[in-house]
């Protein structure tokens, strides 16, 4: 039976990097469901790969039509997981990975108790360094995201697993091992 995995953690914790690392080693283990967002596209991103980029009006219309499994407003933008995307992948028999913010992850757990939630954790100094090196936000926004991250880390005990991302290679191995153990259950 196909499984739903939710990978979450603060902005800059390395969720996407770790997911890519796992899929490079085991491309057969799962497929990533593409989320929708109203945030601007970053350099190197493509429509339908990292996100479905929607206008605020289009996003809110989908909210009104109950098209999302979950959606949240975070840092002034909307993020959501389309039901159609998750159902399409699960219907194909694929294990599905969702990369979500913490609040969205907890909504998924309520709606789908069989989902496996994995929190990607890192210390705040490392998080600050990563956010600065990403060069996509100003210092005020980075400070705001760090405050949010501190709050979000309080919820990590509500997750099924916590992976500490101190070194990417080690954290990729831990995340892959966690997914494999869950699939063997």
How would you describe each model-predicted region?
Residues 44-56, 61:
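Conserved P-loop
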Residues 28-41:
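Short beta-strand-centered segment that lines the nucleotide-binding/catalytic pocket of NTP-utilizing
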Residues 16:
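Walker A/P-loop
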Residues 8-10:
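P-loop (Walker A) phosphate-binding loop of NTP-binding proteins
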Residues 57-67, 81-136, 179:
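ATP-dependent NMP and nucleoside kinases share a basic, alpha-helical "lid"
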Residues 19-20:
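The feature captures the helix immediately C-terminal to the Walker
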Residues 5, 114, 129, 133-137, ...:
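NTP-dependent small-molecule kinase module
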Residues 13:
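ATP-binding Walker
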């Amino acid at each position: 039976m196909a499984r739903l995995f939710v990978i979450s953690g603060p902005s800059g914790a390395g969720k996407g990097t770790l997911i890519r690392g796992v899929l490079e080693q085991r491309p057969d283990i799962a497929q990533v469901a593409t989320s929708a967002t109203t945030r601007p596209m970053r350099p190197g991103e493509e429509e339908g790969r990292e996100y479905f980029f929607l206008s605020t009006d289009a996003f809110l219309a989908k909210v009104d039509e109950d098209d999302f499994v979950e959606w949240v407003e975070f840092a002034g933008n909307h993020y959501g997981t389309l039901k159609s995307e998750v159902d399409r992948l699960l219907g194909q028999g694929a294990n599905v990975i969702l990369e979500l913010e913490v609040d969205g992850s907890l909504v998924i757990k309520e709606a789908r108790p069989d989902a496996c939630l994995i929190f990607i954790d890192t210390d705040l100094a490392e998080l600050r360094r990563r956010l600065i090196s990403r060069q996509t936000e100003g210092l005020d926004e980075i400070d705001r995201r760090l405050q949010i991250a501190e709050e979000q880390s309080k919820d990590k005990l509500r997750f099924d697993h916590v992976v500490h991302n101190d070194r990417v290679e080690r954290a990729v191995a831990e995340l892959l091992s966690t997914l494999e153990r869950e699939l063997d259950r």
